[in-house]
Amino acid sequence: MSVKVGIVGAAGYAGAELIRLVLGHPEFELTAITSNADAGQPLSAVYPSFTGVSDLVFTTHDAPELKNCDAVFLAVPHTAAMAQVPALLASGVSCFDLSADYRLNDASVFEAWYAAEHTSPELLKTRAFGLPELFCQDLETAASDHADGKPVLVACAGCYPTATSLAAAPAVRAGWVAENGPVVVDAISGVTGAGKSCNARTHFCSADENLEAYGVGKHRHTPEIEQILGLTDRVVFTPHLAPLKRGLLSTVTLPLTPQAIDTLTLEDVVDHYKQFYAGRTFVRVLDAGQQPKTASVVGTNAAQIGLALNKRAGVLVATGAIDNLCKGAAGQAVQCANIVFGFDERRGLPTVACPV
């Protein structure tokens, strides 16, 4: 029996990627797509690539058919999910939120960084965090709850936190990272990471042939990265916009303990990372001397990790590459839904990028 799926915010870039993945999923049936701006428009009129594939029509976000779904993905701006998730859960619908509304454990931290009131902080205690490779227990618990007939809420990790944390977590959890000093994260994303609404930074004439840092010292993904890695007030995160449609590269410079500096070799580090991610289909740890490329992961739910050990400076440099729209958004949400509904986490998800 197929899982009936709805997508709120389906006309945005992450929403459109969700449509692509859900329509190709053997266990999912897409029954509702919403967009307040495009309500009444056929999907194929907004995205012609779906011509002949689906005859769905966009409805408004308050469409009653959402409550008849088994799962609803919410790909909406921050604070918008809070307006719908409680009612959907009360109707027995499991929710997979791609926004930041339920990612942070502490509502006061959310309110400080997003300058908005959190209207359902009680859900932060029960939601699962959607980064399967690092929080498998959360999703296993959610799957158990769903099997018992309970609707669940999964807060899917953000794009920058996903690439950054996958690159850094094995070293952090191994105890190699020094207790003091900044952890520097320099990340670059394609323009789709900024969403579909155009602004002065993402306009073609501004973004083309240009690299630009933004949100320096104040980007909202900072507390999420710190929460995942357990590095409170230590992450110096600087995102950059690149003239790419999609793709994200995050380079993390981790200060090492004296013992790690003295004893580790690059081969040790690579072996540890490969063991850490053993059995995790979507994470590929590259051999020593190799570095990841966004072109190797775009269009897939895969992540590539490259490692370099700089003993002179006493740091480990870990770089992660993902597709910001797939592993950083829609693909990760589908991966989480697969786990919750008892399917193989790989079901319906692409793993190999076009080689050229």
What feature does the model see in each segment?
Residues M1-A207, Y214, A308-K311, P355-V356:
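N-terminal Rossmann-like NAD(P) cofactor-binding subdomain of oxidoreductases
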Residues Y13, T126, T162-L166, V216-P223, ...:
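Conserved active-site and cofactor/substrate-binding residues in soluble primary-metabolism enzymes
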Residues E17, L21, L166-P170, E224-I228, ...:
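Alpha-helical scaffold segments in soluble metabolic enzymes
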Residues E27-N68, P182-A187, V191-A318:
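C-terminal substrate-binding/catalytic lobe of Rossmann-fold NAD(P)-dependent oxidoreductases
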Residues A157, V177, V269, V334-C336:
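Bilobed periplasmic-binding protein/Venus flytrap-like ligand-binding cleft at the lobe interface
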Residues L241-P243, I322-G328:
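Glycine-rich phosphate/pyrophosphate-binding beta-alpha loops
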Residues N324, V334-V356:
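C-terminal lid/capping helical subdomain adjacent to the catalytic/cofactor pocket in oxidative enzymes
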